[in-house]
Swiss-Prot record:
The gene is ccmA. Belongs to the ABC transporter superfamily. CcmA exporter (TC 3.A.1.107) family. The keyword Membrane applies. GO terms for cellular component: plasma membrane. This is Cytochrome c biogenesis ATP-binding export protein CcmA. The complex is composed of two ATP-binding proteins (CcmA) and two transmembrane proteins (CcmB).
Length: 221
């Protein structure tokens, strides 16, 4: 399905070229090649322990490929269960700190409003509930204004209203030409996303090197 794109992230792109991932003495996946373009969303699937989260960390630059290489056009933001904020700061100041590092002063205010956190602006981070902490993680992601979002279980800990806000946030990001790569056991109700199954790239699976055709999945009504 076509979508109108704004110019914000129109040049965003991410590509893996024959990438293999080694954790400890275990080769998780190998010969993984794919490309994601501006406005696209990919859901990474596979059994527990197959390397879904490790792939996101490779794409974020936290890990190095055992072989192959990764190319990224556009800034990257990564979100998982870790809050990574000063527990003693008020929430707004904690988010403002990261927004300043990303060079987007003031972006935290809109991000807090989107995730319904503005009422908690003066609350210390340490007092946030589990659900509020997860919304703070997503607010930090939004405030970063990065083109490429890497989401590891983004819906965990969210109530139904917050999940809807997350999906709206994702779709707005894509309309601007942003990229989404996500891992989610709960699934994400994203429009016309694609699926990348790591089952096809486990070591000794017989999958040949080369670009893998992502499977189109229509979940848009």
């Amino acid at each position: 399905m076509g979508r109108k794109r704004l110019s914000d992230f129109g040049n965003a792109r991410l590509a893996c070229h024959d990438v293999s991932c080694l954790r400890g003495d275990r080769l998780l996946f190998t010969h993984l090649s794919f490309e994601v373009k501006a406005g696209e969303a990919v859901l990474i699937t596979g059994a527990n322990g197959i390397g879904k989260s490790s792939l996101l960390r490779l794409l974020a630059g936290f890990l190095k490929p055992f072989s192959g290489h990764i190319e990224k056009w556009g800034r990257v933001a990564f979100a998982d269960e870790a809050l990574a904020m000063d527990r003693h700061l008020p929430l707004e100041k904690a988010l403002a700190y990261w927004a300043a590092l990303d060079g987007v002063l003031g972006a935290e205010k809109e991000a807090m409003a989107v995730m319904a956190l503005d009422i908690l602006a003066d609350s210390p981070v340490r007092l946030l509930s589990t659900g509020q902490r997860k919304r703070a993680v997503l607010a930090r992601l939004l405030a970063s204004q990065a083109a490429i979002w890497l989401l590891d279980e983004p819906a965990n800990g969210l109530d139904a209203a917050s999940v809807r806000a997350l999906i709206e946030m994702i779709e707005h990001h894509r309309q601007k030409g942003g990229i989404i790569l996500a891992v989610s056991h709960q699934g994400l109700d994203m429009a016309d996303y694609k699926t990348l199954s790591l089952e096809n790239f486990v070591a000794n699976s017989g999958q040949s090197s080369g670009f893998f055709d992502l499977l189109d999945e229509s979940h848009f009504s």
